[in-house]
Amino acid sequence: MTKKPIVVGVTGGSGSGKTSVTKAICDHFSGHSILMIAQDVYYHDQANISFEDRLKVNYDHPLAFDTDLLISHIAALRRYETIEKPIYDYAKYTRKKEVEIQEPREVIILEGILILEDKRLRDLMDIKVYVDTDDDIRFIRRLLRDMKERGRTMDSVIEQYLSVVKPMHNEFIEPTKKFADIIIPEGGENHVAIDLMTTKIESILQKHV
């Protein structure tokens, strides 16, 4: 690898369209080697507590994440070092014993709801993107996803949204918008904003020699 890796942070609330924006970046830079890192797999290892206690954890709070490990891994990738990325078991709410070996790439995309909350992590990013989507749309997307993909009931999704997701979004996620270099309204449907973002990434790539 002859160029210094570029780190792109993509954040926004749950259901904002972060995945669509990330896919747009991957499609645009398909000629480059790309590595996607999801903040979700850096939830703390909870093997030492019961399953019942794991269900009580607030997974939308900054303290739910092993941010120190994530920071060390992003820093290592920027130094062209290999990392052992955790594998998270969403059914058991803890990490698996296995890890995934990841090599550094030209473009590293870091995606997650709270990646801009910690200054140490922000400082490792070359460009920071906030996907800004209407609260009602985000809630509907989360409702449909959790019922279809995670077997949740409508009542449980609504209760969690009102008691945890929405308050945490307002307290921790929304305020990080001010740290973004680019704000993309309406997520992956905003092609003009995505074009602006990819142009900015291209200019940074050209300088990273």
Curated annotation (Swiss-Prot):
It comes from Listeria monocytogenes serotype 4a (strain HCC23). NCBIfam families: PRK05480.1 (NF004018), udk (TIGR00235). The gene is udk. Its EC number is 2.7.1.48. Transmembrane segments: none annotated. ATP binds at residues 12-19. It is found in: Cytoplasm. This is Uridine kinase. InterPro entries: P-loop_NTPase, PRK/URK, Uridine_kinase, Uridine_kinase-like. GO terms for cellular component: cytoplasm. It comes from the Bacteria. GO terms for biological process: CTP salvage; UMP salvage.
